[in-house]
Design a protein with these regions (language model features):
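Glycosyltransferase donor-sugar binding loop
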Residues: 37-43, 198, 225-240
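Short His-centered aromatic/hydrophobic patch
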Residues: 92-98, 116
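Nucleotide-activated donor-binding/catalytic signature segment of Leloir-type glycosyltransferases, i.e.
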Residues: 230, 239-259
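A conserved mid-protein helix/loop that constitutes part of the nucleotide-sugar donor-binding site
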Residues: 17-22, 193, 202-216, 325, ...
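Donor nucleotide-sugar binding/catalytic pocket of nucleotide-sugar-dependent glycosyltransferases
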Residues: 57, 138, 142-185
Length: 370
């Protein structure tokens, strides 16, 4: 007897397993054959990326560029894949799978869901490209059964722009969730403090504000460092250049730890404060949720997708976006806390994660849909 198939389609292989690994394992444990569709990549990039028992289908796709001919070709590729595989359900993530994958699923008579993990470039301005993208999104969302959103502001924007029928929308209040056993609480007490930026290295993630803060704080305190963990993304329009990053590292302002697949050893270090002064269109920031789960204090901005991870003055500080001075002041506040006050912040982060971000709550929603 053939197993029923479920497809997960995203624009990066890493995101599928990093954000939805527990959901995928849950369905394989239930006896489904799970197929993952992701863009073509080098063999060296794939090593260790795909767990045993998961089938990967690579598809040619321009992840970030807007090219109608390339996008049409991508649409027909996934249309053929869905026709051949005949899955019982498809989960789409990110803009191109959400649009073209949802249409392809509908044409094949396959039930599907889409997830918008933050509103990207298509919703930031009124350029012709953005208007076309929003129009395509409306078509795609007519073809899908469910649309997952991760915060209330995104929900308001989607309703205001009439992108999707409200009856189809599910708000995941705890984002995509965190495995609270995998990301366990660790003692954070230390006299030496590291303010850690985790994420794609984009100006919109608050890179300039982070660097400006580092320059000032390092003049005032000796036992402090500012570290960045993440990747450069040259495909993104507002990405920090390799040259700029190297310049800030060589000046001694920041340290760069590169990219790691497993961040737990980083979180296991003592004296970590996860600091993300983002003004990017977040869904619900994964790194901040993981930081909460491991008991790290948070400094982040009062924007959708970030503010949900911090209770100001309780487990960290919530500051205005695009405000280096506010970030500097928040860092000063943390540096001047007593050991006991820092410990209470760490404990409060873990409590917040247990209250809001448990992955089991998300898995229950996936189960109800299928």
């Amino acid at each position: 007897m053939h197993k029923k198939k479920i497809i997960f389609s995203d624009n990066t292989l890493w995101a599928i397993f990093n954000f939805r690994g527990n959901v995928i394992k849950h369905f394989t444990d239930k006896g489904y054959e799970v197929i993952v569709i992701a863009p073509e990549m080098e063999e060296s990039e794939m090593q260790g990326s795909v767990p045993d028992g998961i089938r990967l289908i690579q598809v040619k796709m321009e992840r970030a560029k807007t090219n109608p001919f390339s996008d049409i070709a991508y649409f027909f590729r996934v249309l053929r894949i869905y026709h051949k595989e005949k899955p019982v359900y498809i989960f789409h993530y990110t803009i191109k799978p959400n649009i073209y994958g949802s249409i392809a699923a509908k044409l094949n008579g396959v039930r599907s869901s889409a997830m918008m993990a933050g509103l990207g470039y298509a919703f930031k301005n009124d350029s012709l490209v953005s208007k076309i993208a929003r129009g395509l999104y409306k078509i795609g969302m007519k073809c899908t059964e469910n649309l997952f959103l991760l915060n209330k502001e995104n929900l308001s924007d989607i309703l205001r722009l009439k992108i999707c029928n409200p009856k189809k929308i599910t708000l995941l209040k705890g984002g995509e969730g965190v495995d609270l056993k995998h990301f366990g609480y660790t003692d954070n007490s230390s006299d030496d403090i590291t303010f850690l930026f985790i994420g794609r290295i984009l100006f919109e993630k608050g890179y300039n504000e982070f660097v400006e803060c580092a320059k000032q704080i390092k003049k005032e305190y000796a036992n402090v460092r500012f570290e960045i963990l993440g990747t450069l993304d040259p495909t993104y329009p507002n990405s920090v250049s390799k040259e700029r990053l190297e310049e800030d590292v060589q000046s001694g302002t920041i340290c760069y730890a590169g990219f790691v697949k497993d961040v737990r050893p980083i979180y296991a270090r003592k004296g970590i404060v996860v600091t993300l002064p983002s003004f990017y269109g977040e869904g619900l920031n994964r790194s901040l949720m993981e930081a909460c789960a491991t008991g790290k204090p948070i400094i982040t901005t009062d924007i959708a997708g970030c503010r949900e991870t911090v209770e100001d003055g309780i487990n960290g500080y919530c500051i205005p976006p695009k405000d280096s001075n506010a970030l500097i002041e928040a860092v000063r506040k943390y540096m001047n806390l007593t050991d006991e006050q820092r410990k209470k912040m760490s404990e409060a982060s873990r409590m917040l994660a247990e209250k809001r971000f448990d992955i089991d709550n998300v898995i229950d929603i996936y189960d109800r849909i299928i």
